[in-house]
């Protein structure tokens, strides 16, 4: 980046130097024209300056013509010289930068050689002043054409055309060459020639003759062919780069999916698929880079051919070709940069799945070394109890080791991050190198630790096998040895034992009986304690099971199946009741409560609260419409009047008075059908079906007949719910005894 910045500064400095050279030529021409033609020369310079400004108005990067001023003129002269001096000084110590300047700036090689005293500065110039003037006259044309060529070159490199301001895209279309006349300023050779004439002929300054416009010569055939070949090669390179970018994007997207699928399903074929995709990715990248190299080689060849064929007559065409080549190079560079960004991401993905595969293979090898013949591809692993214990111990050891390693790596990573931040800030220049060395050393330590752990497990497995074999042999040898000793000692002790047997037999029998009696008492006590404990455990488990069964019964009565109509929500409670009876077998209270459950609830089931609430809405609507109809029925006018009355009577916001809510004495005989229904609706909305049933019992006439079925179902639900609550309370009380 530093070299690129210096290169841009050098180009700008050379550009200003060329402009300064043109200004000096104009001033030299004006001063040599004599006092008689000074005013005419000054008017001529102003006209030529206007023409030059019109020709250079598209050339934004060149500074304006120098004006006679004070300090600004000095700065304008000193700045280009300082920039050129800096470029020459830097080129002295950097050969690559010197080659770059000599390649991109024509004539820079000679200037650098002269400045560095590598060759004589005025080689071939005689001491004769007249000869020097003649050579200056003859060299004006050459200098003018050289300035024209250099100015065109610098304009192509640094000038801002309309195409330079556009945003660059990664996927590039074939570029069409822009006519050189739209980008290049007017040739300064005409201005130089016009201003240079007063040097040789002062008398002709008053009436200068117009300069002859050079004729454009066509480019050589090989240059044209190279230009076409470069366009085709650039299109092919961009196409291959885009194909490679697509392959890299697909590879990055597929890596994580394939790795997750391979880890979950355990398919070995997926790893082969990843390897094939990685190979296809590398092939696509190599093809793109090969196409880019071919295009670069052709561009270099074309640059060489253009440099050889460049003249003052075909400068426009040469500059147009160079502009086209520069655009192609820029487009190829943009696509290449995007390729390398995706390539970096692909390298991370490649490391990711290869590390996963490496860890998987390491785990398989380790398990196979510990358990020979075990296949991890099987869905069910047939492991003995000892192998299972060893496997659990192995996994537990690995988990502990990985946790410690993770904590240590996290701590080290924080320290390294701090060091890296400090090194970026410039606190310590050696911190970055030290952190990198520590990182590599730590990686080697981890690698050695993994290898040592693997060796330790292998040694541990082999040692266990050898230890078991040796213990088995030692046990057999020890058993044989003990058998021989016992046989020998048996013969020796038989005689003494027989003698002492009769003497101690009575004493031993007495002691044995005493010990046996004591042990028998202890065993009986332990048996009683265990039986009591088992009884307590059984009772506690029975209480828990009873509570669970009662909870199931209560849930069946309380809640309903969501999304099912209330007519289809009926479900017999026989299974729950049988489960409670089976769990609480022998409990008189549970048996009495179960006997009190209605038979209809056992065989048919009961409507839950949601269903009764939904049915109550229908019952309330019909009962309000039939409020005036008696129980035995009436005529059609009565029905119609009752319906009209239900339409005009609205529901109050507070259907129950404060006295009723506080259970104060109240005359219920004053309530009509609508008041009763409003109060029942109030309690149904609050899930107080018992109070709602009490109010519904106050209904009379057709309304009571309509609500009779609902009252029956509500009563059945309340009875069943009361039984379930009683059983749950009994189960909870029984369970509290054994907490």
Swiss-Prot record:
Its predominant location is: mitochondrion
**BP terms from Gene Ontology:** cristae formation; mitochondrion organization
Return the GO cellular component terms, semicolon-separated: cytoplasm; MICOS complex; mitochondrial inner membrane; mitochondrion
Q: Which domain of life is it from?
A: Eukaryota
Q: List membrane-spanning regions.
A: 69-89
* Topology in membrane: Single-pass membrane protein
From the UniProt entry, list the residue stretches annotated as the region Disordered: 23-63, 154-219
Q: Which InterPro entries match?
A: MIC60 (IPR019133)
- Coiled-coil stretches: 283-339
Query: Is Mitochondrion found in the keyword set?
Result: yes
Q: From the Swiss-Prot or TrEMBL record, state where the protein is found.
A: Mitochondrion inner membrane
Here the segments flagged for biased composition (Basic and acidic residues) are 163-198
Quote the subunit structure annotation: Component of the mitochondrial contact site and cristae organizing system (MICOS) complex. Interacts with the mitochondria-shaping protein Opa1.
Q: What is this protein called?
A: MICOS complex subunit Mic60
Species the sequence originates in = Drosophila melanogaster (Fruit fly)
**According to the entry, what is the taxonomic lineage of the organism?**
Eukaryota, Metazoa, Ecdysozoa, Arthropoda, Hexapoda
Coding gene? Mitofilin
């Amino acid at each position: 980046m530093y070299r690129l910045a210096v290169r841009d500064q050098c180009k700008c400095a050379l550009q200003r130097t060329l402009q300064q050279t043109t200004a000096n030529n104009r001033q030299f021409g004006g001063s040599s024209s004599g006092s008689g033609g000074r005013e005419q020369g000054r008017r001529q310079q102003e006209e030529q300056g206007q023409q030059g400004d019109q020709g250079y108005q598209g050339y934004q990067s060149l500074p304006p013509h120098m004006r006679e001023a004070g300090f600004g003129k000095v700065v304008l002269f000193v700045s280009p010289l300082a920039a050129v001096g800096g470029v020459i000084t830097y080129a002295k110590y950097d050969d690559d930068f010197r080659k770059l300047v000599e390649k991109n700036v024509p004539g820079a090689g000679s200037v650098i050689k002269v400045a560095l005293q590598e060759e004589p500065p005025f080689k071939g110039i005689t001491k004769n002043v007249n000869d020097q003037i003649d050579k200056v006259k003859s060299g004006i044309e050459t200098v003018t054409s050289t300035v024209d060529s250099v100015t065109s070159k610098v304009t192509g490199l640094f000038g801002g055309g309309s195409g330079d301001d556009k945003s660059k895209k990664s996927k590039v279309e074939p570029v069409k060459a822009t006519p050189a006349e739209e980008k290049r300023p007017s040739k300064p050779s005409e201005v130089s020639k016009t201003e240079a004439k007063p040097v040789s002929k002062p008398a002709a300054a008053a009436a200068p003759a117009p300069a002859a416009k050079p004729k454009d010569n066509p480019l050589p055939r090989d240059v044209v062919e190279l230009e076409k070949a470069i366009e085709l090669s650039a299109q092919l390179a961009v196409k291959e780069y885009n194909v490679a970018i697509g392959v890299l994007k697909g590879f990055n997207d597929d890596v994580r999916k394939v790795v997750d699928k391979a880890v979950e399903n355990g398919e070995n074929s997926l790893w082969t698929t990843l390897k094939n995709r990685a190979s296809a990715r590398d092939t696509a990248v190599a093809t793109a880079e090969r196409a880019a190299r071919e295009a670069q080689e052709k561009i270099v060849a074309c640059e060489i051919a253009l440099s050889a064929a460049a003249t003052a007559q075909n400068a426009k065409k040469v500059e147009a070709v160079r502009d086209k080549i520069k655009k192609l190079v820029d487009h190829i560079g943009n696509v290449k940069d995007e390729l390398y960004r995706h390539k970096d991401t692909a390298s991370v993905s490649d490391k990711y799945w290869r590390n996963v595969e490496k860890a998987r293979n390491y785990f398989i090898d380790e398990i196979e070394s510990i358990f020979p013949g075990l296949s991890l591809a099987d869905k069910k692993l047939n492991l003995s109890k000892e192998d299972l214990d060893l496997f659990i111990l192995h996994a537990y050891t690995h988990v502990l080791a990985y946790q410690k390693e993770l904590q240590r790596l996290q701590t080290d990573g924080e320290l390294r991050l701090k060091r890296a931040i400090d090194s970026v800030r410039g606190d310590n220049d050696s911190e970055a190198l030290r952190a990198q060395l520590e990182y590599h050393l730590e990686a080697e330590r981890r690698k050695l630790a993994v290898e040592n752990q693997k060796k330790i497990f292998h040694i541990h497995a082999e040692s266990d096998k050898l230890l078991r074999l040796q213990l088995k042999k030692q046990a057999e040898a020890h058993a044989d040895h003990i058998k021989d000793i016992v046989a020998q000692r048996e013969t020796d002790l038989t005689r003494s034992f027989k003698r002492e047997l009769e003497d101690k037999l009575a004493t031993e029998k007495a002691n044995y009986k005493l010990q046996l009696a004591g042990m028998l008492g202890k065993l009986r006590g332990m048996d009683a304690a265990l039986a009591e404990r088992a009884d307590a455990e059984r009772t506690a488990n029975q209480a828990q099971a009873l509570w669970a069964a009662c909870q199931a019964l209560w849930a069946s009565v309380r809640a309903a199946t969501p999304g099912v109509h209330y007519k289809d929500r009926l479900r017999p409670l026989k299974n729950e009741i049988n489960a409670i009876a089976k769990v609480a077998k022998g409990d008189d209270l549970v048996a009495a409560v179960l006997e009190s459950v209605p038979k209809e609830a056992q065989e048919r089931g009961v409507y839950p609260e949601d269903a009764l609430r939904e049915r109550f809405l229908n019952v309330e609507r019909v009962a309000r419409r039939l409020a005036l109809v008696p129980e035995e029925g009436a005529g059609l006018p009565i029905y119609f009047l009752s319906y009209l009355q239900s339409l005009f009577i609205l529901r109050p916001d507070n259907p129950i008075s404060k006295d009723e809510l506080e259970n104060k004495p109240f005359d219920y005989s004053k309530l009509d059908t609508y008041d009763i229904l409003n109060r029942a609706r109030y309690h149904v909305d609050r899930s107080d079906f018992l109070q709602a049933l009490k109010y519904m019992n106050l209904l009379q006439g057709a309304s009571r007949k309509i609500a009779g079925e609902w009252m029956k179902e509500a009563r059945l639900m309340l009875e069943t719910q009361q039984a379930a609550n009683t059983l749950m309370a009994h189960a909870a009380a029984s369970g509290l005894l054994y907490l």
